[in-house]
Amino acid sequence: MQVLVRDNNVDQALKALKKKMQREGIFREMKLRGHYEKPSEKKAREKAEAVRRARKLARKKLQREGLLPSKPKPAFGADRRPSAAAR
């Protein structure tokens, strides 16, 4: 995997590299290969991931059809945490 470093801007090149690696799924693969996973554990994990994906797809479909309310989006510029004075 190659990333061009322009004008000696290493930070920008590192950011681009991380983005490429994330897109390729390298971080996820490194995490999975960090230790041995028994075939039964792998099967259970993959099944749980499939269930999660199916639920998410069904939820998105219901939201599109208007049967489920979608999550309210935070107001632009709104601070999520209360200020130090309000605590």
Swiss-Prot record:
Alphabetized Gene3D superfamilies for the sequence: Ribosomal protein S8
Region of interest (Disordered), residue spans: 35-87
InterPro entries linked to this entry: Ribosomal_bS21 (IPR001911), Ribosomal_bS21_CS (IPR018278), Ribosomal_bS21_sf (IPR038380)
UniProt feature, compositional bias: Basic residues: 53-62
GO MF annotations, alphabetized: structural constituent of ribosome
Amino acid composition bias (Basic and acidic residues), ranges on this chain: 35-52, 78-87
One GO-annotated biological process of the protein: translation
Taxonomy, superkingdom: Bacteria
Gene Ontology annotations for the cellular component aspect, listed alphabetically: ribonucleoprotein complex; ribosome
PROSITE patterns named among the record's database cross-references: RIBOSOMAL_S21 (PS01181)
Keywords: Ribonucleoprotein, Ribosomal protein
Family from the record: Belongs to the bacterial ribosomal protein bS21 family.
Designated name of the protein: Small ribosomal subunit protein bS21
Organism this protein belongs to: Rhodopseudomonas palustris (strain ATCC BAA-98 / CGA009)
Gene label: rpsU
